């Protein structure tokens, strides 16, 4: 229940009298085993209804390593894995979220991808599907072949009707002389050449839920979350989120403050988190913080700001965030040197970073977490070494102000060139490069006492394969799942051996997809979706 989008769309659909929106999550392997042993279907949390009884089943694809979760849920829910095998008696299977920006790898399993904002798009697609079921019937009085034919026609009408819907089965893919997939092109008349994202103009039109779901057990990020701004004024070359969420739109400060107070009173939460890609870039930040303090201080509710830009405003922001609670500061400098930041399109300086951290320590913060990346183009040893050097400098600064050790964490991820970003044509650095970089970081962190965390390399390479691949990867995903791949984004359950075997069996050219740069004159397989 930590996903803001799920809470928002759940509340939006349930405000309507003609829809009942319920929740279901991928089960842990022990629950999956118990369901299969007892021949029970996967069911919704609200009414324990089997998934196959719903009209529409929607997945949010937040991360490529959740793809096998989709197959687990479809199979446990009694729904055919492949879109082509479903009839009008089966739910419409839709998906949205960041990973839907390249629909191709999951095109065998998803009927329709909703691209862009879901507030208006989801109800429109759901209403349309009910019309199609009324027009063509639910499949119970039809032969399987006839019902599949009607379903295909209904999906085709959706692809023609909605400019924000990607229906991969109505696009054909050809391959160039090097075996690279070209841009998919329509194979039916009336299907658009290019899919355009759905966009809402005014965030205030779609208010976050006040009476949001409160789980009976504590969950990750157990707090009231309010989206204050969608989009980002920054243009970092590696960042896919800023591309997918364009243009920048803001919620009014008075609405944010009111929603925060009402939500805390309704749920009992003692923390409010302001959600955006760069909260300190919110145009009326000082006014917003003043209104939040007025509304929340009497309730003993704290405010969390997880996404802060490192610039000249950071010192002012630290003063605005001063509360009675000692808490942590999270920053994303991405690179340790000013020169590399200019190259990646993130115009911040170490001067601003150090000044902001000094202000944070002075105003009661005793913990700083910083997010970096390694594997950027033209990266040098100085860039790698600089990560620990910068963290060590901040650690010494904190000790000077507090008179004792503060916590400084350097969290290093591996750069994956994502579709739709300015660096989408680049290849990912090799496994050997990352291993050497990680070894150097570990060595230097031990000498300085800096807490170092870095992303697992095997899962980063798999992420690159799944986000940059084409529909041929559908066989690979399914084979890995049948071999036992489950909950791949959870380190306790990740089975790299399943993926290695599946990749070998399905003859995937990993080097071409992951590591080779795509020539400027070559087409990209995700180009039929435009942002």
PLM regions with names:
Residues 29-30, 105, 172-176, 283-284, ...:
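Flexible glycine/acidic-rich beta-alpha junction loops that bind and position SAM and/or redox cofactors
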Residues 8-20, 294-298:
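Short helix-loop-beta junction
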Residues 26-139, 146-187, 422-470, 478-491:
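Glycine-rich beta-alpha loop elements in corrinoid/cobalamin-binding modules
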Residues 239-255:
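Iron-sulfur (Fe-S) cluster-binding segments and ferredoxin-like electron-carrier domains
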Residues 70, 122, 256, 285, ...:
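Aromatic/hydrophobic pocket-lining residues that form the small-molecule binding cavity
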């Amino acid at each position: 229940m930590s996903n803001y989008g799920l809470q928002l769309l759940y509340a939006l659909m349930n405000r309507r009298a003609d829809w009942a929106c319920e929740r279901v999550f991928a089960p842990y392997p022990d629950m999956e085993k118990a369901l299969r042993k007892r021949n029970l279907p996967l069911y919704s949390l609200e009414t324990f209804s089997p998934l196959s009884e719903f009209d529409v089943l929607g997945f949010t694809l937040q991360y490529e390593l959740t793809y096998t979760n989709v197959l687990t849920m479809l199979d446990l829910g009694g729904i055919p894995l492949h879109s082509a095998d479903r009839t009008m008696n089966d739910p419409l299977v839709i998906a949205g979220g960041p990973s839907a920006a390249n629909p191709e790898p999951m095109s065998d399993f998803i009927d329709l991808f909703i691209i862009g904002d879901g507030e208006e798009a989801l109800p429109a697609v759901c209403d349309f599907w009910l019309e199609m079921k009324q027009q063509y019937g639910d499949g119970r009085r039809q032969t399987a072949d006839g019902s599949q034919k009607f379903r295909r026609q209904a999906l085709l009408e959706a692809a023609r009707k909605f400019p924000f819907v990607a229906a991969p089965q109505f696009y054909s893919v050809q391959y160039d002389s090097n075996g690279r997939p070209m841009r998919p092109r329509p194979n039916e008349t009336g299907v658009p050449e290019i899919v355009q994202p759905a966009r809402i103009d005014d965030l205030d039109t779609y208010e976050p839920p006040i009476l949001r779901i409160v789980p009976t057990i504590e969950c990750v990020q157990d707090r009231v979350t309010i989206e204050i701004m969608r989009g980002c004024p920054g243009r970092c070359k590696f960042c896919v989120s800023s591309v997918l969420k364009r243009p920048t739109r803001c919620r009014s400060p008075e609405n944010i403050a009111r929603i925060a107070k009402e939500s805390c009173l309704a749920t009992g939460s003692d923390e409010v988190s302001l959600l955006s890609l760069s909260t300190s870039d919110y145009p009326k930040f000082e006014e917003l913080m003043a209104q939040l303090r007025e509304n929340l201080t009497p309730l003993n509710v704290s405010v969390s700001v997880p996404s802060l830009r490192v610039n000249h405003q950071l010192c002012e922001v630290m003063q605005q965030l001063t509360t009675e609670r000692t808490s942590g500061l999270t920053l994303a400098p991405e690179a340790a040197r000013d020169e590399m930041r200019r190259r990646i399109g993130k115009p911040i300086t170490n001067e601003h970073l150090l000044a902001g951290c000094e202000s944070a320590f002075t105003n009661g913060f005793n913990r700083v977490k910083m997010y970096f990346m390694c594997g950027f183009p033209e990266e040098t040893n100085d860039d790698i070494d600089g990560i620990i050097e910068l963290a060590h400098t901040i650690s010494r600064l904190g000790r000077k102000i507090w008179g004792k050790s503060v916590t400084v964490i350097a969290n290093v991820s591996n750069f994956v060139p994502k579709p739709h970003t300015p660096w989408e044509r680049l290849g990912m650095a090799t496994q050997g490069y990352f291993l050497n970089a990680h070894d150097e970081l570990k060595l230097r962190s031990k000498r300085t006492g800096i807490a170092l965390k870095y992303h697992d390399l095997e899962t980063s390479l798999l992420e690159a394969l799944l986000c940059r691949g084409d529909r041929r990867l559908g066989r690979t995903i399914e084979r890995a799942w049948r071999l036992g791949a489950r909950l791949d984004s959870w380190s306790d359950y990740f089975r790299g051996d399943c993926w290695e075997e599946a990749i070998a069996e399905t003859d995937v050219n990993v080097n071409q997809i992951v590591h080779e740069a795509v020539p400027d004159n070559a087409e990209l397989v995700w180009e039929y979706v435009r942002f």
